[in-house]
Structure formats: structure tokens, C-alpha cells
From Swiss-Prot:
Region described as Disordered: spans on this chain: 169-195
Protein topology in the membrane: Multi-pass membrane protein
Cross-referenced PANTHER family: OLEOSIN
Protein name, UniProt field: Oleosin Bn-III
Biased composition (Basic and acidic residues): 180-189
Bilayer-crossing regions: 68-88, 90-110, 111-131
Region Hydrophobic: start-end pairs: 60-131
InterPro entries for the chain: Oleosin
UniProt function note: May have a structural role to stabilize the lipid body during desiccation of the seed by preventing coalescence of the oil. Probably interacts with both lipid and phospholipid moieties of lipid bodies. May also provide recognition signals for specific lipase anchorage in lipolysis during seedling growth.
Keyword tags: Lipid droplet, Membrane, Repeat, Transmembrane, Transmembrane helix
Localization terms from the record: Lipid droplet; Membrane
Amino acid sequence: MTDTARTHHDITSRDQYPRDRDQYSMIGRDRDQYSMMGRDRDQYNMYGRDYSKSRQIAKAVTAVTAGGSLLVLSSLTLVGTVIALTVATPLLVIFSPILVPALITVAMLITGFLSSGGFGIAAITVFSWIYKYATGEHPQGSDKLDSARMKLGSKAQDLKDRAQYYGQQHTGGYGQQHTGGEHDRDRTRGTQHTT
């Protein structure tokens, strides 16, 4: 049985060999194409390297040009500032008794105008809020104002009731004169003091 298996294996392997050989020859042709493509790729890489080198050189030239021009402009600005200070310093020293009070006055005027403008805007905002509240539009925060008004009203009513109660008590509204302390304790307990 092993002999038949070998022969069968040998036969099938022989039958497959020519096909494998065709595949190998195809692979060889592909290898040649790839080697040609590899040469093209090398040429492309060389061209790409040349291109990237020229690009880097262009970037460097641009950077040097821009940096140099900015350096020249900054040095001109520095020279102009030094010349202006040289000319202006004696003038500032001579006119400082006039300029310093003038600058202080101008600063105070500007501050006054800005603050009065701010107060004017605040006043307009407040009057607008009051107008909306008075016309019943319920602006923002009006519910807090209403609750505070209710609390204040209830406290005022409570104080008024206490004043009436103590006023009637001291004037003899309950039929007798009261000295004070005993009746207050009894009132908190819910009983009346009789003497």
C-alpha cells in the first residue's frame, strides 16, 4: 500500500512540476520588471533628493532675506528712537513745568468724562429697569424685589401690631395699669396676668 502511495505521490508531483516551473519563470519575469522598477525608483529618488536640496536652499535663502530685512528695519527703528530721544530730552526738561501739570489735567479730564459716561449708562439702565417694573414687564430680579417688599411689609405690620398692643396696654386699654415684665412672660405662655 505504501508503494501505491509513493507512485501516486510521484505521479502527482511530476504532474505539478511543469506548472511550478511555469510559475517560477513568471516569477523571474516579474523579478526583472521589479529590478527595472527599482532602477526607475533610484532615479526618482535621486531626482527627489535634488529637488529637496534645491527646495531647502530656497527656504534658507528666503529665511536669510526676510531675517536680514527685519534686522535692518529694527536697527533703523532703534537709531530713530535714539535720535528722537536726543532731540526731545532737552525740550522735555525745559517744558516739564508746563507739560506735567497739563498732562495731569488732561488725565483728570479724561477720567472725569469716562466716569460720567459710565454713571450715565448706569443711570439709564436703572431708569429702564424701573420703567419696565412699573409697567409690569417683570424685568430680571423683580421677583426678588417683590419677595423683599413682602417680607418688609410683614415686618412693618408686625411692628405696628406690637406698638398698638403695648400702647393700649400702657394707656389702660385693658382696664389696668401694667408694669411690664410679668405680662410679657404670661403673654408668651398664652395666659393673662390679673392683679
